[in-house]
Design a protein with these regions (language model features):
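Pocket-flanking alpha-helical
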Residues: 19-55, 142, 162-167
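Ligand-binding pocket segment of bilobal, Venus flytrap-like solute-binding proteins
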Residues: 33-37, 106-183
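A conserved helix-loop-strand patch within extracytoplasmic ligand-binding domains
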Residues: 56-109
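A bilobed periplasmic-binding-protein/Venus flytrap-type ligand-binding module shared by bacterial periplasmic
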Residues: 68-80, 202-216, 239-240
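C-terminal functional modules
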Residues: 200, 213, 221-273
């Protein structure tokens, strides 16, 4: 909403497309969608790099924010599970995260995005099963309920995100990611399988646009190049809606008032309203 508002202030019309992460690439290539403000390394880099290779989209910069997407738990879980955040501890304590007293395997909640979690579970022999939820709102609803009940929960989370500033928690400390972990089975502790590591701990968050944006809307293109989000900015934007319950319009208003100095620096004098 913030970026949309800034574009509207340039005198342009804005339409918000509710589109899946998978479908966004074809839409960007065809010009059905014109910009994506946040491309996250762990969940989107494969498709993103493939699209760049064939010049189907244009990359126009990297945010200052450092991203991470991985297994996460609220801090209070450590009271019941010694050894956290070390990944080996979650096997010892897998029963704490179980919904089935028979097999005792823990449940890992995630969305429809492909992080290779099934591969990680196999490669590290984790005593967990995966429950996929339809969207991030469903993940946060389950998290909020667990926190209210102080119940152990393991789920996909990312930073920057609303939990950074509203709920204390930690990422599981898996073996450190390298590119070899995804391609060379001999790398790492499991010599037979790839993905015996976590996701990148210091991932990039990039901006990408339709290749025709610069020619058709040069001022929007320049604005997109100038926009630079910090971790705090992204976390606060998310928290205003998810944790504080503001509408997206009200959250955008509060956010823009808080970061008005940054916004001023993003505007191009020749394009300013």
């Amino acid at each position: 909403k913030v970026v949309g508002t800034l574009i509207q202030q340039l005198g342009e019309k804005v339409e918000y497309q509710n589109i899946s992460a998978e479908d966004q690439w074809g839409a960007l290539r065809k010009g059905l969608v014109h910009l994506q403000v946040e491309v996250w390394q762990a969940s989107m880099s494969k498709d993103f790099n493939k699209m760049l290779k064939y010049n189907y989209i244009e990359e126009i910069g990297t945010h200052s924010a450092i991203g991470r997407e991985d297994w996460w738990y609220p801090d209070y879980v450590e009271q019941s599970c010694n050894g956290l955040p070390n990944w080996q501890a979650i096997n010892t304590c897998s029963h704490l995260f179980s919904e089935d007293s028979i097999n005792g395997k823990g449940v890992y909640y995630t969305g429809l995005w492909d992080f290779g979690d099934a591969d990680i579970i196999r490669a590290l022999n984790l005593q967990f099963t995966i429950t996929r939820l339809s969207d991030d709102k469903s993940i946060w609803d389950i998290l909020k309920t667990a926190v209210r009940e102080k119940r152990p929960i393991m789920l996909l989370n990312w930073t920057p995100n609303w939990t950074d500033v509203r709920i204390k928690g930690k990422f599981v400390d898996f073996p450190t990611y390298t590119s070899e972990c995804e391609s060379d089975p001999s790398w790492g502790i499991n010599k037979d399988l790839v993905k015996d590591c976590g996701n990148p701990k210091n991932g990039w968050i990039k901006k990408t646009v339709w290749t025709g944006l610069k020619d058709q809307w040069p001022c929007v293109y320049q604005l997109m190049k100038n926009i630079d989000f910090s971790n705090e900015m992204i976390a606060e934007a998310s928290a205003l809606v998810i944790a504080d319950g503001h509408s997206e319009d009200k959250a955008a208003e509060i956010w823009m008032n808080k970061y008005h100095k940054n916004i001023s620096s993003w505007r191009n004098s020749s394009c300013s309203p």
